[in-house]
């Protein structure tokens, strides 16, 4: 099994001949593109739905940090059948296990929700607000003037907005207001991903 990240307009892989493609719109967002690349009858076509089901179960459980996996191309190019033990359950389990291993080897990235944030603040207090935004991994996209106020437009990870209302009120003595709206998902920085993976490993170790 070979896994690739999916994105709109991407070219199909050329390493293995694709016999059939199924695109699944995932209930939690994003897509799964399932390519059957089996040649020579290594796996009967009747078992491919079971493999797909196993993959989707593992994607929903979260093979990396317990969070949904999305926007993935899966290429199934080889396998084996047993004259007695081959059945749908066996291939569903094989699909789960193969996906888990291939997913980790594919260098997956953890995505986080990014929000557009617009802050209206008295111009003389803008510096403190900007410093706080930088500490929250926000990216300032632009600023406008409106009378005695400055409107700051930025993108900020949702994870960094915890208690932001309280912090902004403290910085500006309650003289600033803000509004937020979902924008997109982006990969977290590598240092943040390392911390999340370590925390998840410790959590699952404690649960065992």
Where are these regions (language model features)?
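Accessory interaction regions appended to the cores of large information-processing enzymes
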Residues: 1-208
């Amino acid at each position: 099994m070979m896994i690739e990240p999916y994105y709109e307009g991407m070219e199909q892989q050329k390493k293995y001949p694709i016999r059939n493609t199924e695109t699944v719109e995932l209930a939690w967002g994003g897509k799964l593109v399932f390519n059957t690349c089996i040649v020579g009858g290594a796996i009967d076509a009747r078992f491919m739905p079971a493999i797909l089901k196993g993959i989707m179960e593992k994607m929903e459980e979260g093979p990396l940090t317990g969070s949904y996996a999305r926007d993935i191309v899966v290429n199934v190019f080889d396998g084996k059948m047993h004259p007695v033990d081959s059945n749908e359950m066996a291939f569903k389990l094989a699909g789960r296990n193969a996906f888990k291993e291939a997913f980790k080897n594919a260098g997956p990235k953890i995505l986080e929700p990014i929000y557009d944030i617009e802050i209206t603040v008295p111009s003389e207090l803008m510096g403190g607000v900007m410093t706080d935004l930088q500490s929250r991994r926000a990216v300032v996209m632009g600023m406008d003037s409106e009378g005695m106020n400055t409107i700051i437009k930025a993108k900020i990870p949702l994870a960094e907005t915890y208690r932001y209302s309280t912090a902004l009120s403290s910085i500006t003595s309650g003289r600033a207001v803000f509004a937020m709206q979902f924008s997109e998902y982006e990969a977290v920085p590598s240092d943040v991903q390392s911390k999340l993976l370590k925390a998840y490993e410790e959590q699952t170790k404690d649960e065992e």
